[in-house]
Amino acid sequence: MFLGYSDCVDPGLAVYRVSRSRLKLVLSFVWLVGLRLHDCAAFESCCYDITEAESNKAISRDKAAFTSSVSTRTPSLAIAPPPDRSMLLSREEELVPWSRLIITKQFYGGLIFHTTWVTGFVLLGLLTLFASLFRVPQSICRFCIDRLRDIARPLKYRYQRLVATV
């Protein structure tokens, strides 16, 4: 039953039997969630792909736009200039060059993100496998029914004795 061809998987070995529709539903759900997570991770990594020169160009462009707009507006409507980059960094981040910091954040952020969702799907798959292998839902229900029966049996006899004495 567990090692060999199954009707739920066409070309290959089946670990446990599930209906074809349920298998397709679970696989499509896992595929869609994985695709969505991959898109989010790709988007985040694109956001971090900025070199030091590009960020300096953007800052100088913003400063130039700010100085040109300040002269045409009244001081009460002027927007404050962007803060200096050194003010935004913590003490440890100041020691690391800006481009290396971005690459490090991108690498470890992506690594942690992908590791988390891959580990989650592997654990979900193992949980499903062992639940079906050991028939966990049926055994839990059987255990509960047996415990309830053990509790109800003495109560039933007490009730019968009480009714018989009255």
From Swiss-Prot:
Protein name according to UniProt: Protein UL5
Subunit structure: Interacts with host IQGAP1.
A GO CC annotation given for this chain: host cell cytoplasm
UniProtKB keywords: Host cytoplasm, Host-virus interaction
Top-level taxon: Viruses
Keyword Cytoplasm: no
InterPro entries: Herpes_UL5
Family (UniProt): Belongs to the RL11 family.
Biological function: May play a role in rearrangement of cellular cytoskeleton towards an efficient viral assembly and spreading.
Localization of this protein: Host cytoplasm
Chief place where the protein resides: host cell
